[in-house]
Amino acid sequence: MTAKGQMLQDPFLNALRKEHVPVSIYLVNGIKLQGQVESFDQYVVLLRNTSVTQMVYKHAISTIVPARSVNLQHENRPQAAPASTLVQVETVQQPAE
């Protein structure tokens, strides 16, 4: 996996883990798993539900759907500066003398 791919996956999975967000994980074969992300590494996600912890290989995952939105904060990356404000200036031509 490229470093760029990890820049998206790791903050997303880490936010799900830290905030204990319930997730639905859809596998490429259509099976739906539900639980909370307990841990993850480059190749697997540990998904915990009430009765068991499952090791799910990332190559088998199609989609991860959180039950609510999560705040993604990329580590080692400063927050974006506030967008600059655009001001529309109207110019009036003075009559020629």
From Swiss-Prot:
Ligase recorded as keyword: no
Molecular function GO labels: RNA binding
Compositionally biased residues, Polar residues: 85-97
Keyword RNA-binding found: yes
Ranges where the Sm domain occurs: 10-70
Cysteine-cysteine disulfides: none
Primary role: RNA chaperone that binds small regulatory RNA (sRNAs) and mRNAs to facilitate mRNA translational regulation in response to envelope stress, environmental stress and changes in metabolite concentrations. Also binds with high specificity to tRNAs.
Full protein name: RNA-binding protein Hfq
Organism: Neisseria meningitidis serogroup C / serotype 2a (strain ATCC 700532 / DSM 15464 / FAM18)
